[in-house]
Every structure is written in structure tokens, then in C-alpha cells.
């Protein structure tokens, strides 16, 4: 409650609660990369530093929206054990004719009623999941539902029946894989004449290994 003086009396009002605000929509999930309009990122970190967290390194962003892509329906649609639902074509996201990803709404999830381990067959996780959100995030990673968006890659597909046999469990795994198609991490070594090494890598750790083996005396 806030009080403000006004002449000889006080006026009071209450601040509006913050928890009723609606979250902003996540437009990033509808983005598809334009691989013909790519610019290498500018690095402001020491890629050779021992403390650099290169496991979380991403080599490019996905800035281009595909206006023809079908948006997801708000009501969840689940499968009964496999990806054979006839309505799936309406929900699939695509990139240049390739299957981009199968939405998480299409993965049938066991009901979460109490803290428990993952029930997926042969799951190696020993975590006791305390919330349904953490459980669902883990469970979906058992399904390879993200696919490479480079047409000639063995991890790309146009066939929905290949879901689960190729692809990646997370967007991060797919981004790490796709960086191999267009390496952007250049070796920072320069010779005495100022010429930079021409080797380019898709991963920071691979570049560091090259730098130590070839250039560091």
C-alpha cells in the first residue's frame, strides 16, 4: 500500500500484482534459419581461455521467420505409442521441404502424480523428479524430434516415419551438429608477418586442440 499527501488529506492506492501478467510469446520457436544470409558472429571472449565454457557455445542464431509455416494448435495432441497419427501433417514444422521438428505436444507423456524416476525403458537416469515440469523436460529427450536443416545431411529427413531413428533430442544438440556444416570458429594464431591461420572449426574445443598441437611451442 502506498500513501501520498495531497493538500490536507492523504490518498492511497495499491500497486497492481505482477503475477497476473501474461508472458510474452516465444517467437524464437517459430524461427527457421536462412542459411544463405548468414554472417559470422563477433567474439568478445578469449576462446583460448581455460575457463571458457565452450560446451554452451553456439555458432549462429536463427533470425529468419518462415511466414508459410503452420503454427501449432493450442490444444495438445498426443500419440498412442508411435508417430502414426493422421493429423500430424497439420502440426509438423518444416524448413525448405525438410522436416524441421516434431512439436512436443505430439509426444505422449505418462501422467505425473508424485515424485518418481523416469519410467522410460532402459533410461539410465537415477534422478527423482520432484515436479512435472522437470519430468516432462527429461522425458521428451528420449525422443529424437529435431532434424538437421541441411538437405544433404544424413540427419535430415522428409519422412515422418523416420522420427526416432535419426535426428536429435534437443535443439542444443542439433545446433552443435549444424555448426559442422558451416564452421565459424577460426584459429586466432598469426605468424610473424601478421597472417592469420586459415583453419576454421565448428567447435571451440577442436580449435583449442589444434592451436596447442600446431602453434603452441
Swiss-Prot record:
A molecular-function term among this protein's GO annotations: nucleic acid binding
Keywords, comma-separated and alphabetical: Metal-binding, Nucleus, Zinc, Zinc-finger
What is this protein for, i.e. what is its function? Answer: Transcriptional activator of part of the core trichothecene biosynthesis cluster.
Zinc fingers, C2H2-type class: 185-215
- Main localization, broad class: nucleus
Q: What is this protein called?
A: Trichothecene biosynthesis transcription regulator TRI6
What does the record note as the disruption phenotype of the gene behind this chain?
Reduces transcription of TRI4 and TRI5 and does not produce trichothecenes but accumulates low levels of the trichothecene precursor trichodiene.
**Localization per Swiss-Prot or TrEMBL:** Nucleus
Keyword set includes Ribosomal protein: no
Q: Which domain of life does the protein's organism represent?
A: Eukaryota
Asked if the Swiss-Prot or TrEMBL record annotates the protein with the keyword Cytoplasm, the reply is no
An example of a Gene Ontology cellular component annotation for this protein is: nucleus
An annotated GO BP: regulation of DNA-templated transcription
Amino acid at each position: 500500500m502506498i500513501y501520498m499527501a495531497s493538500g490536507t488529506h492523504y490518498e492511497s492506492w495499491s500497486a497492481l500484482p505482477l503475477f497476473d501478467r501474461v508472458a510474452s510469446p516465444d517467437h524464437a520457436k517459430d524461427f527457421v534459419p536462412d542459411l544463405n544470409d548468414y554472417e559470422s558472429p563477433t567474439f568478445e571472449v578469449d576462446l583460448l581461455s581455460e575457463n571458457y565454457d565452450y560446451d554452451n557455445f553456439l555458432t549462429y542464431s536463427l533470425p529468419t521467420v518462415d511466414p508459410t509455416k503452420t503454427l501449432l494448435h493450442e490444444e495438445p495432441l498426443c500419440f498412442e505409442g508411435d508417430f502414426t497419427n493422421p493429423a500430424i501433417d497439420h502440426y509438423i514444422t518444416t524448413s525448405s521441404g525438410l522436416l524441421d521438428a516434431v512439436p512436443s505436444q505430439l509426444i505422449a507423456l505418462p501422467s505425473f502424480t508424485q515424485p518418481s524416476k523416469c519410467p522410460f525403458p532402459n533410461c539410465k537416469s537415477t534422478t527423482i523428479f520432484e515436479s512435472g515440469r522437470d519430468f516432462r523436460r527429461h522425458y521428451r529427450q528420449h525422443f529424437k524430434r529435431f532434424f538437421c536443416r541441411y538437405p544433404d545431411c544424413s540427419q535430415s529427413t522428409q519422412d515422418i516415419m523416420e522420427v526416432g531413428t535419426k535426428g536429435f533430442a534437443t535443439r542444443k544438440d542439433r545446433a552443435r551438429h549444424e555448426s559442422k556444416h558451416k564452421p565459424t570458429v577460426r584459429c586466432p594464431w598469426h605468424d610473424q608477418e601478421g597472417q592469420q591461420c586459415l583453419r576454421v572449426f565448428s567447435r571451440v574445443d577442436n580449435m583449442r586442440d589444434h592451436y596447442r598441437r600446431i602453434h603452441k611451442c
